[in-house]
Amino acid sequence: TVYGNPDILPVTEETPFKAAQSPYGETKQKCEALLNCSSIDSVSLRYFNPIGSHESSLIGDRSTDKPSNLIPIICKSVTNNTQMLVHGDDYETKDGTCVRDYIHVVDLAKSHVAALNYLILKQGKHVYNVGTGNGVSVLEIIKLFEDANDIKLDYEVGPRREGDVVEVYADCSKINKELKWSAEKTLENCMVDSWGWENNMDR
């Protein structure tokens, strides 16, 4: 995440950046710094955690054999009949596991359309959080996936993973107000669509 490990939640667009927890997070911070130094009109969309796929199961993320994101990890665990590793359960969160703001990729795509249309009408530099505003833990995601797809996951808890932000979720009031955009898909939609895409890839 561009915010690092924030002190106050939810994060707004005015929340100061903390130290990036990974090279990926650092690139996000540097890209925004470059845009701020340029004369280019721009919209920076600060994604939170995109998940899901198109409900048709025809468009999705073809992850590597060793995915690093939670939902692809879950799906690969099921398809390969292997045990999944939860990276730490001793964080200061509601159940000890990391907390994220998960957003369906279809909602995310719609936010891009809204942002481009807004930039046509209102030039300048704009920044928006793109999330749902809800913090969900790793263990909660596992339970949601199991319930939505009637699947029992095999997992164990291991040590923390370097570079993981403990907890972050968005205040989306700015994008709701200015772009008239808000997430519509539920987490259950995300779980069903993710598993549908994974099954379709194996055919």
Regions found by a protein language model. Give the residues of each.
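C-terminal substrate-binding subdomain of Rossmann-fold SDR/epimerase-dehydratase oxidoreductases
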Residues: 76-203
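C-terminal catalytic core of Y-nucleophile DNA break-rejoin enzymes
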Residues: 68-71, 104
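Catalytic helix-loop patch of NAD(P)-dependent Rossmann-fold dehydrogenases
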Residues: 2-49, 58-69
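Short alpha-helix within the catalytic core of nucleotide-sugar-dependent glycosyltransferases
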Residues: 36, 71, 109, 113
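A short alpha-helix capping/helix-coil boundary motif
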Residues: 12-15, 51-55, 122, 150-153
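Short aromatic-enriched loop/helix-cap "lid" or pocket-rim segments at secondary-structure transitions
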Residues: 7-9, 54-59, 98-99, 141-142
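Short amphipathic alpha-helices and their capping/turn segments at secondary-structure boundaries
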Residues: 38-39, 72-80
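Feature marks short, surface-exposed loop/turn motifs that line or immediately flank catalytic pockets
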Residues: 3, 51-54, 134-136
